Amino acid sequence: IRDRYYSAHYLGWVWLCIFSVRLLAGGVIKESLSMSEEKLGQHYLAALNEAFPGVVLDHAWQTKDQLTVTVKVNYLPEVVEFLYYKQGGWLSVLFGNDERKLNGHYAVYYVLSMEKGTKCWITVRVEVDANKPEYPSVTPRVPAAVWGEREVRDMYGLIPVGLPDERRLVLPDDWPDELYPLRKDSMDYRQRPAPTTDAETYEFINELGDKKNNVVPIGPLHVTSDEPGHFRLFVDGENIIDADYRLFYVHRGMEKLAETRMGYNEVTFLSDRVCGICGFAHSTAYTTSVENAMGIQVPERAQMIRAILLEVERLHSHLLNLGLACHFTGFDSGFMQFFRCLLYTSPS
């Protein structure tokens, strides 16, 4: 259940990009930390060194509660599994990065929120050979990694060897092969999509049923869907035996836009517009990343204002979803009552 929850509630590609800024600036942040400031997560680092002697190649604190460890690539699945199951970590997100101009390699980051004992963030980093872009898949050991590894494969062309599900995740079926959007040198917009065919190229998987099940397609456009998404229900009579789905129909390529067309101070306007009802959360995430990368101390008053606005936005989102639950069941009067409350709670 935990693995499926975190896969379904994957934390969005925009957040991945801005989190990369924080991680890549690790050297700057490490120097800016006060020597007297307590660094959280030291016992996790000690546990890693004890369980895997000689595997940790480097480590650095980005902030007092954010630790990045670079490990040998062949030990990646074991290290993530150890932190996930033995140390109480939750795999929050994973992403790739093109660091060839920095060190000649690609890199993949697995970000875990440590919830057992001392709470902090630990990011497991591995360098991937630019000439042979392969690394061992974590998914067979930690199933929650499947979405992230599929996305890294799509966007960077880094192959997770042993990944059980090799279907595309973000890119459409007619996207040109060997064109990976988030590589730094991926700027050839002259390539065109492959010709479309009547045959379906994306295979929806029915793991729990068999070929006797009827298939009920829902989407990608449906009256009850807020965003485009295609669901396949495998049914036996009235019982749903299994389900599979495909999202990212409105993927807008915001990372590439921010990277190639905007300065650091202009991305805030883009992050505000990622989502119609949670713009402040996205803009706060980006701003916090830049502040951490630059070693900027945020005034307490600014932190309090952010907390208040984030809480108002959270309540706003809860009310909206409660109203939508009423709408989906045909109780539109309930939806309108919640919508009326939204008018008085909106941060704007």
Task: Give, region by region, the residue ranges found by the protein language model.
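Conserved small/polar residues in nucleotide/adenosyl-binding loops
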Residues: 1-3, 344-348
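A generic alpha-helix preference that emphasizes hydrophobic side chains
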Residues: 2, 149-150, 283, 312
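Terminal low-complexity/charged segments
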Residues: 6-239
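Catalytic cofactor-binding cores of redox enzymes
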Residues: 167, 173-179, 183-239, 243-346
